[in-house]
Amino acid sequence: MRYAIYTLGCKVNQYETQAMETILTGRGHTLTEFDAEADVYIINTCSVTAVSDKKCRNMIRRTKRTHPDALIAVCGCYAQAKPEEVAGLEVDLVAGTGDRMAFLDQVEQAALDRSIPTQVSVDNALKRHDFEVLPAGGLVGRTRAMLKVEDGCGNFCTYCIIPFTRGPVRSESIDAAVTQAKALAEAGYHEIVLTGIEISSWGQDLEGDVSLIDLLEALCHAVPTLRVRLGSLEPRTITEDFCRRASALPNLCPHFHLSLQSGSDATLKRMNRKYTAERFLESCRLLRQYFDRPAITTDLICGFVGETEKEFAETLAMIEKADFSAMHIFPYSRRGGTVADRMPDQLPNAVKDARCHQAAAVAAQMEQRYLESWVGETLPVLFEEEADGLWRGHAPNYVAVYAAGADLHNVLKDVKITGLHGQALEGVIL
C-alpha cells in the first residue's frame, strides 16, 4: 500500500512518526508525500493546548475532504484524549499514544478490508507500565536522528493534559538505548537527539539508583563519533554532580533547554511547577561554571491564570538574570480537562499578547548578545540543507550557521564565524 503520515506536535511525535515510517516501509509499503495520492493517510496528533486540538481537527477534515476514498487513521495525544470526538470526524481508525505495532497491524488490515467499521482502540494511559521500544532514526531527509529514551510524565502541571495522554514515566534501559545509538552511528548519522516526554525523569522507574547522567555517560562513551544532544530538561536535573560529569563528555552538545514557564514564584506555584526562580537561576549558574558559553534556552508562558503585573515584572527581571540564548514565548492557552482551566481570574487575550511582546523584546536582545559572542570563533557545524543560496547547519550549541560550499548535506565541517545572518551566524568553511 501507499501511505503518508502527517505529524503535529513535539519531537516525541516526530520520533514516533519516523518509527512508523521505518516499520511500514520495512513491511514492503511505500511512503509518499502527504499531498500526494495514497491508500492510507495517518495523522499523528497533538493535544498540548486547545489550539493544538483545533489544528488536528482541521487537518483531519481537510484530509477527509481531499481524499474521500482513502483510509484515514488517527493516532497521538488528541486521539488519546478525545477518541470519540475523533471518531465523530468519520475517520477509519482511532488509536492513542500506546502500542504502535498493534496500531500499524490494524492499519494494514483495514487497508485490505475497507468494509470494517470505524475502530477505536485507545487504552487507559495512566495504567501503562512498560516502555515501548520503537526503531530509532530520522525523518526522511534529516541529518540528525532522534532516540526516544523515555515516555510519560508525573509532574501534573496545572495547565497540562499530557500526563493523562502519555501515562506515567517509563524509561528505556541503558543497554537498549546504547544498542540503538550504535545502529544510528553505523547508519551514517552524525548526531542523535535524546527525546522523551520528560527525560529528566529517565531512570526513576528502573531498578538501581540510576539517573539521566548515567544514561548520558553510557551513550557518549558507546558512540564517541556521534554528537549527543539533549531534549527539554527540568531545572532539578542540573546539579553540581550532573554538570561535573556531563562537562567531561566531549561529544555532549552544550545546549540545555530548561523549561521555565514563569519567573515568578507565585505563578510557578499556581502552575504546580516544582522549583523556584532562584533554583532555576542556580541551574544556569552551574551550567556556565562548567561549560564554555553553553546555549541555555527556555519556554515561557505569558498571561497564565491570575498572573498580576507584579508577577509578570518579576518574570521579566528573572529572564534578564538568566540571560537566555533563545526563548520560545507563548500566550497561555486554556486546555479543557486541566486544573488551570477551572481556575478563576483568567486573563484577556489582549493582556497575554501584550506580555508576550514585552518578553520577546527582552529575548531578542539576549539572543543578539549570545550570537555576537561567537563572531571570530570556530565552530563545528553539521550541515543539513540549502537555504538563502548557502548551506545551513547547526553548531553543537544548536545555533544555526550559514556557509557557502558544494554539497554539504550531512557533512560536518569547521566554520570560522564572520558575522550574523539574521537570527543565526554566518562564516567560512576552514
Task: Say what each PLM segment does.
Residues 1, 29, 70, 92, ...:
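A structural micro-motif
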Residues 140-143, 153-155, 252, 262, ...:
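Short flexible coil/turn linkers enriched for glycine and charged/polar residues
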Residues 1-202, 241, 246, 252, ...:
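Proteins enriched for Cys/Gly/acidic motifs involved in redox and nucleic-acid/cofactor modification
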Residues 47-48, 166-167, 206-209, 269-275, ...:
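Short glycine-enriched, charge-decorated loop/helix-capping segments at active-site entrances
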Residues 258, 299, 319, 327, ...:
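Hydrophobic, well-ordered secondary-structure elements that form the walls
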